[in-house]
Amino acid sequence: MTDDSRSIELEVEVPGTPEEIWAAVATGPGIGSWFVPSTVEEREGGELVQQFGPGDSMTVRGRVRIWDPPHRVVFDGGDEGVGMAFEWLVEARHGGTCVVRLVHSGFGSGEEWNDQFDGLDAGWRMFLHNLGLHRRYFPGQVGVAVQPLGMAAVGLDEAWGTLTGALGIPAAPSEGDQVAAGPDAPTALAGTVERAVPRKLTLRIHEPGPGTAVVAVEGTDGQAAISVWFWLYGADASDRAPALLEGWQRWLADLFPVPD
């Protein structure tokens, strides 16, 4: 059962025209530049396909329920009134910016939904901040998402300590700090801390290339999801992405091995 009164409602102000911001939140290349690789049939009733990690099990399919460019798009699972829905609203402001509003609805009632609600709320805050970085520093460009992901049956704080220790970066840096991974990381990783909250860092990077990155531990104690995600820009970003994914995916698997 879903609770119509329970939804995540967030907004962020980003630079750009409504048409530019629409492209960022309603089209496949735009969404993939700050969130996850996506394809969108740009019409009402069209298909949405999103890839949340390596493998077919991480592919999620949905529907374009409402398509009203450049101001409103709604994605859902395809069944009217059932499951989650994601409404994006774009409103122009003076000075060349727009407010992007997200309404994520369709949560179930009951305490068993609390962890998922809180986790998704925190995740959306992280990704909306990344949307702002995409528009602020890489306007007019398309980013390539690279999504190494690990899992660990440990507490979240323990996983964060293990991850940051292996990377050789501070566990609690301040915004504006410069950080760089140490020699044990599979590739270079260096940049400016743009956002720092418990167990989540967002970086504007210059290594392994221009772009943004997220270092995060999410989930619940005993089911920790570990991410070192990149959004790369530049003419060779697509060429560099497969090797980057392979190297970091292997590194995370070695750092957080699955018990026999």
Summary of predicted features, one role per range:
Residues M1-S7:
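Short acidic N-proximal helix/loop "leader" segments that mark the beginning
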Residues E9, G16-E19, G28-R63, D68-R72, ...:
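Short beta-edge strand/loop motif at the mouth of beta-sheet-based domains
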Residues E11, R63, E87-L89:
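Short, surface-exposed charged micro-motifs
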Residues V25, F35, G77:
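Short, flexible helix/strand-to-coil boundary loops that buttress conserved ligand/catalytic motifs
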Residues A26-T27, H129:
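Solvent-exposed alpha-helix faces
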Residues V74, G78-L120, E194-D260:
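Beta-strand/loop substructures that line and gate deep hydrophobic ligand-binding cavities in soluble
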Residues G106-T164:
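Surface-exposed beta-loop interaction hotspot
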